[in-house]
Amino acid sequence: TGTMFMEKYPVQTTLTLRHLREFWTPQVRAGLRNSVLLGLGTAAVGTALTAAAALVTARYANRAARWVHTLSVLLMAVPGLVLGLSFVLAFKGTALYGTVWILILAGVLHFFTTPYNLLYQSLQKLSSELESVGCTLGIPPLRLIFDVLLPQCAGTLADMAAYFFVSSTVTISAAAFLSTASTRPLALLVVQYSDQLNLSGAAYLSFLILAVNLLARAAAALVRRLVRR
């Protein structure tokens, strides 16, 4: 990261702030906006879907739940490159192709397993009698989920959202096949600058990604701290 403060690394290592102004171009601003939108969308959609899957598999013992659990774990075995190429073949020519939504969908599937396992383990630690008590008291299942189960795992949900956000903003495997000029995230611009031997520019973009991800992690830590009070 220090190379962005050097005149021309590694030829001229004089310290300068010139690059900070030069690299703040419309292309970089668009890439930053795309990365934030991608991160927020993946965090929202991914957290919702993984929460639904974990609730089904951790709290209900039936054949459908076992299938959902198996598929959720198997998603980890799919490489990002394979996922990206599969999406190109499946969605090319559709309205979804070339939009940020296809990047969000790919990101959710790519990073699904780890957040799923986090919430799955948290839900299994809760008493297995909660559903029986709720049924006895006449509490609707959805109310039990939103008023009891999910609030008990609020810190885990925040960590899941942060994981989706951070992972989606730094990945390049699936995004390399699915992004267009208007949806290209900063991570791909880092690769482009690096290939052009523009190391200062690549370092600057990497620093921007790091700063955004630190904010996401700080927000998750704040939520977890508030939950513990």
Question: Can you say where each PLM-predicted feature lies in the sequence?
Answer:
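Hydrophobic alpha-helical elements at and bordering transmembrane segments
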Residues: 1, 28, 32, 36, ...
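Transmembrane alpha-helix signature in integral membrane proteins
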Residues: 26-59, 64-67
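Membrane-interfacial helix termini and adjacent extracytoplasmic/periplasmic loops
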Residues: 6-10, 14-17, 22-26, 60, ...
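Loop-to-transmembrane-helix entry motif
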Residues: 27, 35-39, 43, 71, ...
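A structural signal for multi-pass alpha-helical bundles of membrane permease subunits
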Residues: 1-8, 34, 84-95, 106, ...
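Faces of alpha-helical transmembrane segments in polytopic inner-membrane proteins
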Residues: 46-49, 72-83, 96-120, 140-143, ...
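C-terminal transmembrane helix and the adjacent membrane-cytosol boundary/short C-terminal tail
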Residues: 55-63, 120-130, 135, 139-148, ...
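Interhelical loop and adjacent transmembrane-helix boundary motif
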Residues: 4-8, 12-27, 169-221
